[in-house]
Every structure is written in structure tokens, then in C-alpha cells.
A protein has these predicted regions:
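Mid-domain, small-residue-enriched loop/turn segments at the edges of structured enzyme/sensor domains
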Residues: 119, 132-186, 190
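Bacterial Sec-dependent N-terminal signal peptides
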Residues: 1-23
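Short, well-structured active-site flanking segments
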Residues: 77-95, 141, 196-200
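Structured C-terminal helix/loop/strand segments within mature extracytoplasmic catalytic/sensor domains
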Residues: 20-32, 136-137, 141, 184-215, ...
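Soluble periplasmic/extracytoplasmic beta-strand elements of cell-envelope proteins
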Residues: 41-45, 54, 70, 91, ...
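Active-site SXXK
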Residues: 50, 62-90, 253
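Conserved catalytic neighborhood of penicillin-recognizing serine enzymes
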Residues: 97-133, 141
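Beta-lactamase-like hydrolase cores
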Residues: 19-59, 281
Length: 290
């Protein structure tokens, strides 16, 4: 019998087990975010001890550009099956253009580009034209959602350009997730349990090259420390998901917001300021902890 998508991915599905809460850290974070004018969800996990912080971590939030991590997962799934290769070439067409300031949009119709460069544009600069093209190359959002479901993720979904998900798109736009599920996806990559070790290593290398590091929480991590991250933002949303490879206590940190009162795009934006504050707190807690 030919193995199904579900039977293959079930081998790597997220583990379900009781997690201990770091009550001291949870209290510190709750104090840090007190008074925030919007809705917030936070998931933190010490990957050495397994202790967690869950603050509305099972609430669904818009992904904004963090949807590009599930899209990457769909692409790497095909690489794992041998249907795509890191050096596979694709031909750009003007019909692929998504209006904006994307680098790929400057290409001329007929120019060729390697899959690895499309992935770099999606994950490093968050190029939307590249991302929507990669969503198609991965088999479309519905196929990505089937993969996510088989991995055990029930709330993480691609909504844009997916028949039957129009109502979800109206609420959450391109994609949706919870802080906990996104943190678990990052953890599976970090622990090399999503695909082969080589492919998970490749995913981490791609996630380690985030261009957006000035306003965001990642700015509070010393540049000598590897951080695997993706951020996303639209008017009322500021999100970040990351694993900080602290020497003795590597940790997951996911912070999602929605319905934010402050929709400014300055460094002082309330959500960005809060994310930096929590990130600094976490680095002080984990980064120097024996």
C-alpha cells in the first residue's frame, strides 16, 4: 500500500504532553505587558527544561507575514519528497506581480530565478510576490493546510487564495495561527523533527537571515547569538516568532497582537515597544542564566 500524506507526517506530529509553567517568568511578563491597548498572546518555552509561559497562547491571531513559515514548510515537504530541489529554476512572469516594493517585482518577464533565491526573498526580506508564487509552487494553500493538519496543527492555516476559507480570510487575512502552535512548529524545525536533519538545518539557516531587526523584539538579542525568526505586521497587528539559541537555555518566543490601538509605523509603536521590552526581559532571564 502506498503511504498517504497523513501516515508519513504522523511520524513527525507534534507531541502532546503536560508542560510545566514557569510561574516566576509568567508573572514578570504579565507585569511587562500590563496596560497594552490591544489583544496579545505570548508563548515562551525553555528548550532545556521544557518549562513554558502561556498567555492567551491558544488564541487565534492573524499571522501577517509569519504565514511564510507554513509556506516554507510546504516547499520543504516537496523537497523532502524529491519533487523540488533547492536549485530548481522557475521563470518569472509579470502576472505574478503583487503590487508593492518587493524586489522580485523588478524582474523582467521571462527571467529565471532559483528556488533558493525565492525562499531567501520570502524569509529574509518578506517579499510578497515571491511568497505568493511559492504558495503556488507548494501546491497551493489547501495543500499546505493538509500538511499542517497532518502535523497536528489545528488552527494554523493559509487563508488567502484558498477556496472555502473566505470567511476566515475576512477575519484573519492571509493566514492564521496561535502563539503556541507557531512556537511548536519552530521547535520541530529546531529539534530536526519536521523533515530530515539536513532539511531542518536548511530551514534554520533561512530563518537566521531576517532583514527586519530594528523595531522588532529580535533587536534585543546580542548579534553574536543565532536567532531563527520571522516577523509579520499589518495595521493593527505586530507579530514575531523565534527561537533564540542562547548558550545554555535556548528558548522559543512567540508574541502576537491584534486589534491594536496604535497603528503607527514608527519605532515607538506601542506593540513594537512592548515586544522589545519582553524580549529584553527574556534575554536577561535566559541568556545569562546558568
Amino acid at each position: 500500500m502506498k503511504p498517504t500524506l497523513f501516515s508519513f507526517l504522523l511520524l513527525f506530529a507534534i507531541p502532546v504532553f503536560a508542560q510545566k509553567t514557569d510561574k516566576q517568568l509568567q508573572s514578570k511578563i504579565e507585569q511587562a505587558i500590563s496596560g497594552f491597548q490591544g489583544e496579545i498572546g505570548i508563548y515562551v518555552k525553555n528548550l532545556r527544561t521544557g518549562k513554558t509561559v502561556n498567555i492567551h497562547a491558544d488564541t487565534i491571531f492573524p499571522t501577517a507575514s509569519i504565514v511564510k513559515v507554513p509556506i516554507m514548510t510546504g516547499i520543504v515537504y516537496k523537497m523532502n519528497k524529491g519533487e523540488l530541489h533547492y536549485d530548481s529554476l522557475f521563470t518569472y512572469k509579470d502576472s505574478l506581480l503583487y503590487e508593492g516594493e518587493d524586489i522580485l517585482g523588478s524582474f523582467k518577464s521571462g527571467e529565471k530565478i532559483a528556488l533558493k533565491k525565492l525562499l531567501m526573498l520570502m524569509l529574509t526580506t518578506s517579499d510578497n510576490t515571491a511568497s505568493l508564487w511559492l504558495q503556488t509552487i507548494a501546491g497551493g494553500g489547501a495543500n499546505i493546510n493538509r500538511i499542517l493538519d497532518s502535523l497536528g496543527f489545528k488552527d494554523t492555516r493559509v487563508n488567502s487564495r484558498v477556496p472555502g476559507r473566505e470567511a476566515f480570510r475576512a477575519i484573519y487575512q492571509w493566514g492564521q495561527t496561535t502563539p503556541k502552535e507557531m512556537g511548536q512548529l519552530f521547535e520541530m524545525i529546531y529539534n530536526r523533527k519536521l523533515f530530515s536533519s539536513d532539511l531542518c538545518d536548511r530551514m534554520m539557516r533561512m530563518l537566521a537571515k531576517n532583514y527586519w531587526d530594528e523595531n522588532e523584539a529580535i533587536s534585543q538579542i546580542p548579534p553574536t547569538i543565532a536567532v531563527f525568526s520571522k516577523n509579520g505586521c499589518v495595521n493593527k497587528t505586530r507579530n514575531e516568532a523565534m527561537i533564540v539559541n542562547a548558550p545554555k537555555n535556548p528558548y522559543v518566543f512567540c508574541i502576537f497582537t491584534k486589534n491594536n490601538k496604535d497603528i503607527s509605523w514608527t519605532h515607538e509603536n506601542e506593540a513594537w515597544t512592548m515586544a522589545r521590552k519582553v524580549s529584553k526581559l527574556l534575554w536577561g532571564y535566559f541568556g545569562t542564566k546558568p
